[in-house]
Structure formats: structure tokens, C-alpha cells
Amino acid sequence: MYNCAIILAAGKGKRMKSSMPKVVHKVCGKEMVNHVIDNVRKANIKDVNLVIGKGSETVKEHTRDRNVTYSMQEEQLGTGHAVICAEEFLKDKKGTVAIFTGDAPLITNETIQELFEFHNSGKYAATLISSTVQDPTGYGRIIREASGEVKKIVEHKDCNEEELKVNEINSGMYCFDIEVLLNSLKNLNNDNSQGEYYLTDVIEITKKSGDKVGAIVVPYEEIMGVNSRVQLSEAEIVMRKRINHKHMVNGVTFIDCESTYIDVDVEIGNDTIIYPGCVIQGNTTIKEECTLYSNSRICNSVIGSGVIVENSVILESHVGEGTTVGPFAYIRPETKIGKSARIGDFVEIKKSTIGDNTKVSHLTYIGDAEVGSKCNFGCGTVVVNYDGQRKQKTIIGNNAFIGCNTNLISPVKVNDNTYIAAGSTITKEVPEGSLAIARSKQINKEGWLDKKGLLKK
């Protein structure tokens, strides 16, 4: 059986008060429309078409790596009109098409699979997703036959007294036999107060043709649409609970899961402990038995097993197993830190490689450098990598001892097994086995204060 999907992503989203199309706003680090696309793909649906409108180039930019096709809805004339705009996508296809909305990011791949299975096994012409709620005010009601089949969808304003008591509501997500859908679209009109073409009318047209219409009921959170910043925040809360619950089931400890913020694509190994206030973003992988103390942010990075991070920021970098980072360290993009290293407080590292067992304990800047293993950086060391026009490279070998308050003026090389005296400004290569001293000779002028009349009596 051939299955495909159409995702409606042309809405303007006026209530978002944004210059961006609504569907590219992110929930837990991923655009809403990409949540829907990815879950459709997880349900083994390969052919996906996005109906786009205002801000189409922005939507394309955010979805071009998803291998989808696009249909253009120049004017927003209703959900039915949006599907009409995708008729070319459905042309010459036979099978089943599901229709989802790009602003409902909480739909799961399990529900999508269930929708197709229910629709195809029951040989329905149309199947919709519904939900039961305590307060259905404002929603279209699902009215069923005695057999359980869907009889009709009635908008709230059109409900009679009995229909108002129904608490099963329409989600706006459907599954259709492609041929039935295309035939029904031919009979769709905009004879209503809004002058729009409604997809709900296709259900009525299908039913009048004598075809079967079914519905599956899912939790309300799965059909939540996002039309405002408030609803975006509500969707974020639901998604965050799902993400954190998944990690806890997989063996991750959260000291306070409600104040821990993890993006949907993050991977975390078991026996890792995460303290409140941590933010883990993007395509980050954290291996087993790590400890992330409060107020740490990690983005698009790989953290090895047994790493400890405390009150620090790690961006687009790799931290080797057994290393400690922080407190208050800043690991900038393209940094690779080896195993069992120590990156201490108020240390900034940028676009550098740090070898195994190297210690950079405090108040140090390292940029555009290659640092070997078993090195020690004293407090206040600075790699001076910028000459005013471009960044220069510094190379430090193994077993180098860099004394406190040292400036390494790039480009420069410090070879293996070297010592640099505290307070030195190094501008030339330091040979292996050497002690480098580059500071002014101390001069003591005895009695100077008394001669100047500065000695306090």
C-alpha cells in the first residue's frame, strides 16, 4: 500500500507577532514543521509535500535537508484550498494520503502509524484524528453513528443542544484514500461567511457519497496547535516533559527535571546526573557517567564518559572522557579536549586542541593552539593569537610547564619537555629541554623612598 503525507505550512501566524513564518519557530530546539516531518518519516512515510505560502523561502531554508517537495499556496483561502494547491503532488498516485498541520509539533510517530493502520485495515475512505476534552468550547464536534463511524463534523457555532454536550473534537489532521480526496475536492466550495474552502467539508462530501469515515482518538496534547507565543511555551513544556521522561527511563538522573532544558535530538548515556538549570542543545551527545552541575550550557558537542561540567559553557566542541570543566569555563567552537584533562575556573579555549592529562586550571586564554599531553598552564597565561589582521597558530608540545602570567605571542612553538618562567613574554621558539625566561631583570634601589621623601614617618 502506497502512503504519503501533505503538511500544511502556509499559515501567516499573525498572533505570533513575528517576522518569521509560524512553522519555523522552534520547540525544544527544532522547528515545529520539522518535528512533524521527522515523525512522519519515523512512521515510514517517504513522500512528503509541504504546502507553503508567505515566507516560503524561509520555510524552504529550514526544511531543505528533509528531502520534501513543495506546493505553493499564494493566497490563504482555507485548509481545503491548501490541499487543492497540492493536487499536482497527488496526481497519478493511488493509495493513502495523510494531512497534517505544520504548527502541531506534538503529534507522535506512533499516532501517525496508528492512523495509517486504522485507515487501511478498516478500508475507510477518510479517517480523522480526534481527541476528547473537558471543555470543547470553540472546537468542531465529532458526531458518530451508532456503529462508531463518523457521521459528521459540526462547528461549535452550528451545534444544537445535544451536539454541544459532545466532548470529542476535531484535530484538523486526516487520512484519505487519494482518489476519494481528489474527487471530493472537485465538489468543494467556499459558500460560507469567510469565503474559504474548508477541509472539514471534504468529510461531509465523502460521507454523502456513501463512503466510510472513521476516527482515532488521541490525547489532546498531541493535537495542540501553536498560534501564539503562549501556546508555543505550552508546547515547549509538553515536549520537554516527554524528552526528560525518555532520558530518565534510559537511566539518566535529573535532580529537578522541570528546570532542565534538553533539545529533542540530544543523546545522553546512562548513569549521567544532571542538576537544575542545565541547558543541553542541538546535536549534543553526552556519554555515560557524566555529572553536569547547575547552570551549564552545552550545544552541538560531544562529551565523553565520566566528564564533570560545572557552571560552564561548551559550544561545538569535543571533551574527552574523565575530563573536568569549570566552574565558569568557556569552551568555544572547534575545540577538542583530550582525556583526563583539567579545564578550571575562568578559562576560555577557542579553536584549539588540548592533549590528555593537561591542566589549565584558572584564568587562562588559549586560542588557535595545539597543546600536547601532560602540560600545565599557570594562572594568567594568555595565548596572544591575534596580530591585528589575522589569527596566528601556537604549538605547545608534551610535558610543557607554562609559568603564571605568561604571554605566548603567536605564531610560536614551545617544544616538548620545556619550562617557561612566570611573567615571561615568549616570542621565539623554545627548544626541547629548555627553560625560557623572558622578563626584565629585577632592580632594587635601596633607600629610594627616603630620598624622594615618600617614606611615611
From Swiss-Prot:
Q: Which EC numbers does the record give?
A: 2.7.7.23, 2.3.1.157
Q: What catalytic activity does the UniProt entry give for this protein?
A: alpha-D-glucosamine 1-phosphate + acetyl-CoA = N-acetyl-alpha-D-glucosamine 1-phosphate + CoA + H(+); N-acetyl-alpha-D-glucosamine 1-phosphate + UTP + H(+) = UDP-N-acetyl-alpha-D-glucosamine + diphosphate
Q: Which residues form a coiled coil?
A: none
GO annotations under biological process? Answer: cell morphogenesis; cell wall organization; lipid A biosynthetic process; peptidoglycan biosynthetic process; regulation of cell shape; UDP-N-acetylglucosamine biosynthetic process
Q: Which residues bind acetyl-CoA?
A: 385-386, 422, 439
Q: Where does UDP-N-acetyl-alpha-D-glucosamine bind?
A: 8-11, 22, 73, 78-79, 140, 155, 170, 227, 332, 350, 365, 376
> Which positions are annotated as binding Mg(2+)?
103, 227
Subcellular location(s): the record lists:
Cytoplasm
Keywords, comma-separated and alphabetical? Acyltransferase, Cell shape, Cell wall biogenesis/degradation, Cytoplasm, Magnesium, Metal-binding, Multifunctional enzyme, Nucleotidyltransferase, Peptidoglycan synthesis, Repeat, Transferase
A GO CC annotation given for this chain: membrane
The pathway entry for this protein reads as:
Nucleotide-sugar biosynthesis; UDP-N-acetyl-alpha-D-glucosamine biosynthesis; N-acetyl-alpha-D-glucosamine 1-phosphate from alpha-D-glucosamine 6-phosphate (route II): step 2/2; Nucleotide-sugar biosynthesis; UDP-N-acetyl-alpha-D-glucosamine biosynthesis; UDP-N-acetyl-alpha-D-glucosamine from N-acetyl-alpha-D-glucosamine 1-phosphate: step 1/1; Bacterial outer membrane biogenesis; LPS lipid A biosynthesis
The free-text function statement in the UniProt record for this protein reads:
Catalyzes the last two sequential reactions in the de novo biosynthetic pathway for UDP-N-acetylglucosamine (UDP-GlcNAc). The C-terminal domain catalyzes the transfer of acetyl group from acetyl coenzyme A to glucosamine-1-phosphate (GlcN-1-P) to produce N-acetylglucosamine-1-phosphate (GlcNAc-1-P), which is converted into UDP-GlcNAc by the transfer of uridine 5-monophosphate (from uridine 5-triphosphate), a reaction catalyzed by the N-terminal domain.
What does the similarity note say? In the N-terminal section; belongs to the N-acetylglucosamine-1-phosphate uridyltransferase family. In the C-terminal section; belongs to the transferase hexapeptide repeat family.
What is said about its interaction partners and assembly?
Answer: Homotrimer.
The name under which this protein is listed is Bifunctional protein GlmU
* Annotated source species: Clostridium botulinum (strain Okra / Type B1)
